[in-house]
Amino acid sequence: MIGRLRGLLVEKQAPEILLEVQGLGYEVQMPLTSFYELPELNQEAIVYTHFVVREDAQLLYGFITKQERALFRLLIKTNGVGPKLALTILSGMTASEFVACVERDDIATLVKLPGVGKKTAERLLVEMRDKLKSLMEASAGSEREFMLKSNYTPAPVINTAEEDAIAALLSLGYKPAQASKAVSAVYQDGMDSETLIKSSLKSML
């Protein structure tokens, strides 16, 4: 079981990174909420991982904090929620926002996420309520601490910001028309791709 990786961040293309650890390159998929807390390329990064073995692939999912990984692990235990959908959920909202949705029985917000229908949202609310109580008790005071001490700075503005944003939304399961409309609605001159993706996601919730 690979539970933690520490190495050089050599590639970043949302939602995937390539982390070089002692000469080996690990492909890691991350929720966007974690992805944008990473340092710049060619800097050291630490990610907590969840390893999935399937018949046709071996996949690594990465997170900035243990608490976020713990939430991911709870999500994939929910009936009808696999790693891909769990990653989409944590890309569309932070861990604390998801917890708030469960506490408020907020189905309306959950069903706006791609792949989350009404039945899945209802299952999440029912099955996650008790699980989250245990998680919050175990991590009281520590959830999303990294947000307060993050050294993240936006990447330089590039001409393909809109293309990158649309590609990231498509990778999360949004339809081309949805992605294009959301990006166009929030785009402003000077926006970098990371800010544009965040704004686009917020506009759809």
Curated annotation (Swiss-Prot):
InterPro entries for the chain: DNA_helicase_Holl-junc_RuvA_I, Hlx-hairpin-Hlx_DNA-bd_motif, NA-bd_OB-fold, RuvA, RuvA_2-like, RuvA_C, RuvA_C_sf
Keywords attached to this entry: Cytoplasm, DNA damage, DNA recombination, DNA repair, DNA-binding
Protein name: Holliday junction branch migration complex subunit RuvA
Domain comment (free text): Has three domains with a flexible linker between the domains II and III and assumes an 'L' shape. Domain III is highly mobile and contacts RuvB.
Organism: Shewanella sediminis (strain HAW-EB3)
Biological role: The RuvA-RuvB-RuvC complex processes Holliday junction (HJ) DNA during genetic recombination and DNA repair, while the RuvA-RuvB complex plays an important role in the rescue of blocked DNA replication forks via replication fork reversal (RFR). RuvA specifically binds to HJ cruciform DNA, conferring on it an open structure. The RuvB hexamer acts as an ATP-dependent pump, pulling dsDNA into and through the RuvAB complex. HJ branch migration allows RuvC to scan DNA until it finds its consensus sequence, where it cleaves and resolves the cruciform DNA.
Region of interest: Domain III: 157-205
Biological processes per GO annotation: DNA recombination; DNA repair
Family under the similarity heading: Belongs to the RuvA family.
Domain of life where this protein originates: Bacteria
GO molecular function annotation: ATP binding; four-way junction DNA binding; four-way junction helicase activity
Assembly, per entry: Homotetramer. Forms an RuvA(8)-RuvB(12)-Holliday junction (HJ) complex. HJ DNA is sandwiched between 2 RuvA tetramers; dsDNA enters through RuvA and exits via RuvB. An RuvB hexamer assembles on each DNA strand where it exits the tetramer. Each RuvB hexamer is contacted by two RuvA subunits (via domain III) on 2 adjacent RuvB subunits; this complex drives branch migration. In the full resolvosome a probable DNA-RuvA(4)-RuvB(12)-RuvC(2) complex forms which resolves the HJ.
Cell compartments where the protein resides: Cytoplasm
Pfam families noted in UniProt: HHH_5, RuvA_C, RuvA_N
Region (Flexible linker): 144-156
GO cellular component, one term: cytoplasm
Region (Domain I): 1-64
Start and end residues of each stretch annotated as Domain II: 65-143
